[in-house]
C-alpha cells in the first residue's frame, strides 16, 4: 500500500495544484485499489477542508517566508502534509514529512525538498501548538 499511497499523494497534489490555478477538474482516483481510493479521497478532501488552517500554520511556522512567496506546488505539498497529519493518525508524522519532501524534490527541486522539510519539521516539533490552532479552527466553507 505504501507505493500506492505515494502515487495517491502525487495524484492528489496534481488535483490540488490544478484547483489552485482555477482549472476545472474532475477528481478521479479510480486507477487505485479501493483502499487507495479511500486514502486519496480523504487526503484530497482533508487538504481542501483544512486549507485555511494549513495556510495559517504554514505562515506561523515558516521562518521569514510569507505565504504568498511560497510557490504553488510547495504550498500544496505543505497543505496536503498538514491535512494528512490531521486526517490519518495511523501514519507516523515522519513518514508524512518524508513523503512531502520527496514530492518537493521530484516536482520542484532538491532545495524545495529542504525547504519543505524545514517547515514540516518545525510544525511537528510544535505539534501541541498546532493542535491548539486546530481546536480553534472554524470551517468557514461549511453551511452551518
Swiss-Prot record:
Entry keywords, A to Z: RNA-binding, Transcription, Transcription antitermination, Transcription regulation
Statement: the UniProt record of this protein carries the keyword Ion transport: no
Pfam families: NusB
A Gene Ontology BP annotation from the UniProt entry: transcription antitermination
GO terms, molecular function: RNA binding
Source taxon at top rank: Bacteria
One GO term describing the cellular component: cytosol
Entry's family note: Belongs to the NusB family.
Function: Involved in transcription antitermination. Required for transcription of ribosomal RNA (rRNA) genes. Binds specifically to the boxA antiterminator sequence of the ribosomal RNA (rrn) operons.
NCBIfam families linked to this entry: nusB (TIGR01951)
Protein name: Transcription antitermination protein NusB
Amino acid at each position: 500500500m505504501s507505493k500506492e499511497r505515494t502515487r495517491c499523494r502525487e495524484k492528489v497534489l496534481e488535483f490540488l495544484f490544478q484547483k489552485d490555478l482555477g482549472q476545472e477538474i474532475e477528481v478521479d482516483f479510480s486507477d487505485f485499489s479501493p483502499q487507495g481510493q479511500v486514502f486519496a479521497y480523504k487526503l484530497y478532501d482533508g487538504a481542501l477542508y483544512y486549507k485555511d488552517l494549513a495556510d495559517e500554520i504554514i505562515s506561523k511556522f515558516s521562518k521569514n517566508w510569507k505565504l504568498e512567496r511560497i510557490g504553488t506546488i510547495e504550498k500544496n505539498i505543505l497543505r496536503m502534509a498538514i491535512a494528512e497529519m490531521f486526517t490519518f493518525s495511523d501514519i507516523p508524522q515522519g513518514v508524512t514529512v518524508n513523503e512531502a519532501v520527496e514530492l518537493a524534490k521530484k516536482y520542484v527541486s532538491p532545495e524545495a525538498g529542504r525547504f519543505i522539510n524545514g517547515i514540516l519539521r518545525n510544525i511537528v516539533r510544535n505539534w501541541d501548538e498546532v493542535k491548539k490552532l486546530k481546536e480553534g479552527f472554524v470551517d468557514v466553507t461549511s453551511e452551518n
